[in-house]
Amino acid sequence: MSQDAVEATEELVEERERKSWVIDLRPLKVVAYRRMWVGNGVSFFGFQFTSVAVPVQMFAVTHSSAWVGLLGIAGLIPLLIFGLWGGAAADVVDRRKLLLASSTLAWLATVGLFVQALLGMRSGYLLLGLTALQSAGFAVSSPARQAIIPRLVPARLVPAANTLAYTTTTAGGVLGPLAAGLIFGLASTATGVTVAYLVDAALFTISFWATWKLPPIPPIEPEPGEERPTAGLSGIVNGLRFLVTQPVLLLSFAVDIIAMVFAMPRALFPEVAADRFGGGSAVGWLFSAIAIGSVIGGLTSGWIGRVKRQGVALVIAVVGWGVAIGFSGLVHQLWLMVLLLAVGGAADLVSAVYRQSILQVFAPDRMRGRLQGVFTVVVAGGPRLGDLRAGATADVTGITGSWAGGGFAAAGLAMVLAAAFPALLRYRPPAMAGNDEPIVSKP
């Protein structure tokens, strides 16, 4: 076969892949990205054991959803402090080394959770402290991890790489809580949380391996006249200055904050599982439901990259999330609650892919870490504020008022914001900028 025929065949295959509704797997051909994808997926599966165990243990110790909600604040404060700094550092140092160091901190926090559970400590304050330490490690590692992706794959495959990353982590979000729920259904709470923390600590080592095998990812030298990034306050301020000049980015962050703060019902899952469904494995289903929907949304995501009015699609996805969460708070059948939460999860996957891809299109590599730091604060901080809101309002209005009312409020506020500031509704993606060549992985 001639070279022209080979190239024509490859173009035909790519065209079919672009038109397919099935998830785009082309980024997995890049060895470095594939290793990182595997490592992140396995470690996120393990982290879900901890994400279920900590609120379950907190509720068992305190018998209060308000205390469970405080876990949101314990996770939020380090995110605010270290998320922005970690993003600035990712623009200054080798991102691989930064990811290794920050992941070690998060792993040590998980080991601490295992030790306190093994020793039978019953301290809500200790759980809050270890949650804060784990959040600090995540806050630094997340901007570096996300800023690495455009350095590993060609620019045209960045949206597909983001979709693969979200789908894989949410698949871990399905299997992890289900497995954790099975543990809690078969064992006592004390035994269940101990095993859950141990599983997380063990699986985290796969992520270390994947990060170690990454190639060096040093900062790209700025062009003459461009800013040389710093990890200090001035570097963070310069990143924020760039952000405020991009109204589409600001609005995309704002609708996400609304969606997560008002509609995230996660802090209510332990109480609802115990009171409505008798405890046991129900808590695993509730924690898995949103992720189940996200996986389904990811596996059928081939259409996402073909949408031209991505701002409109983002708003529709956020409204769909709020409405689905609102109705799920009104039902008393476990299967129907799981189904509605899954619909919300599919909508959340769509909005997450658009937000991340919009950000990576706007940001040059020299500012990508800092903007990913802001993204980390918004995306990870929003649900934690949502935990606090849900727990606090549940003690005042009851479970239904906190859960359903928050979901419908999020949908309404997102529509009002989009109508008041139509820049997001008018957004269409520009051509992807930047170097189209991937970094070659270590052998």
PLM regions: where:
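Alpha-helical transmembrane-bundle signature of multi-pass membrane transport and export proteins
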Residues: 1-443
